[in-house]
Amino acid sequence: MANCVRCCCWLLVLMLMALAITAAVVFVRYKNGEGVFPFPGVPGAVDHKYADALAVALQFFQVQKSGKLVNNTIHWRGDSALDDGKEAGIDLSKGMYDAGDHMKFGFPMAFTATMLSWSVLEYGDAMRAADQRDSAIDALNWIMDYLVNAHPSDDVLYIQVGDPKADHKCWERPEKMKEKRPLTKITPKSPGSDVAAETAAAMAAASLVYKTINKTYSSSLLDHGERLFAFADKHRGSYTRTFPELSAFYNSTTYQDELLWAASWLYHATGNHSYLAYATGKNKDFADLGNPRYFSWDDKRAGTEVLLSRVSFFASQGSDVAQDDVLGMYKQTADAVMCILLPDSETAAFRTEGGLLYVAEWNSLQHPVASAFLAAVYSDYMQSSGKTELSCSGQGFSPADLRKFAKSQADYLLGSNPMKISYLVGYGDRYPEKVHHRGASIPEDVDTGCDGHKWLETSKPNPNVATGALVGGPYKNDSFVDERDNVMQNEATTYNSALVAGLLSALVSTSSLARSLS
């Protein structure tokens, strides 16, 4: 009897050792870009460089908050814009200021929420390992409360608070604002499919985040998302065609990409195949499949292609979804997007000498950060689904190659660049000190109104640090001028922060992704 017990004990020990060795081998293979990391996946060791940067990046959302602040962690910020929306009988006091001004632009704010949600959905475990998930959800909640209130009925969406021309003439702290803040709304007679669909995407994505946190809130968000999508699709038109004066700020080139983007998110949120059919049916022409694009607040096509590729990557073999030719075309286009991002690919896009993917002069960091996030996500889709190779003009690349590209862009913005400067304010020993930001540039004890331009014009560093701000970034020659009036390079935006938070979350640790976002 004793011998049997000893045998069983040794057998158990051997089994545990075998499991440990297997897990170690799989983990090493994953780290080297090989094999499949097991589901459901546990975050690997935390990379503290990216975790620390993530903690910094998320603080900018606290800097940008409007309304009655709760648990405020930014000593130089206070309550502001408490009467926003009052003229329409709604509460639009929450939400976030767009950049260094005090405008609430609904289009980029909704995109900010969509990207925050996507990041939490894919990398919530990594965020939790870095103790930052709650911070991300707090920022998301502040925006979603605003967006819900901005949609008081099926065919009405308030898309803007403030007059941008009047706002930009003032240089003042948000807490001291006394100017009128008019409201702009879209209706069936004044359409804005782009901003309505982006808001629908934000609602759908956020509903997935809150599904395990607050089911009632999640259901409400999804209801708003479905109604907004119906509104956007039925009453088609671009908001910057309806309101031409707004084209100088966030000009929407087309609303078609937002309709596909929203339908894709609604499919993930509901499982309703009618939304997938919307993107793969006659509306597929909106995607311009076969022609890779860069992802941004204006152009959602690359994001949609990656998001729908998720369906293909994790579909059961032989299923209708797995055999869908149009979904296959979305994935092929997503492959092509990845190929232009990889520096050793034949179709590689232009890089600066310092290694930054360079697409646009204004806010030059937006495209490389957005692209790096997509590359990290795509790498993890490949890794988690067992796909080991991406073919670019016959040349093979691994998931590790995509992750290496994503890291290179993150490292550049964190200081590994010719200027030896971190473009993430508050991270590292050297970062921009004269960020184009009204609140940061004016001492908190100064009682100034709209005429505080001396704080814009001073050569001194900002008295308040806009921690977490990701500024516009360098020129094509990797140079950067840290001056407050250098709006092109030295202004930060909330959507930049959402993008960099997503990228850093992807790099915090290694883990597999869930097969379903729901």
UniProtKB/Swiss-Prot annotation:
Keyword Cell wall biogenesis/degradation set for record: yes
Q: Which InterPro entries match?
A: 6-hairpin_glycosidase_sf, 6hp_glycosidase-like_sf, Glyco_hydro_9, Glyco_hydro_9_His_AS
Q: Which GO terms describe its cellular component?
A: membrane
Could you name the active-site residues?
101 (nucleophile), 436, 482, 491
Question: Under which main EC class is this enzyme filed?
Answer: hydrolase
A Pfam family reported for this protein in Swiss-Prot or TrEMBL = Glyco_hydro_9
This chain belongs to the protein called Endoglucanase 18
Q: What is the lineage of its organism?
A: Eukaryota, Viridiplantae, Streptophyta, Embryophyta, Tracheophyta
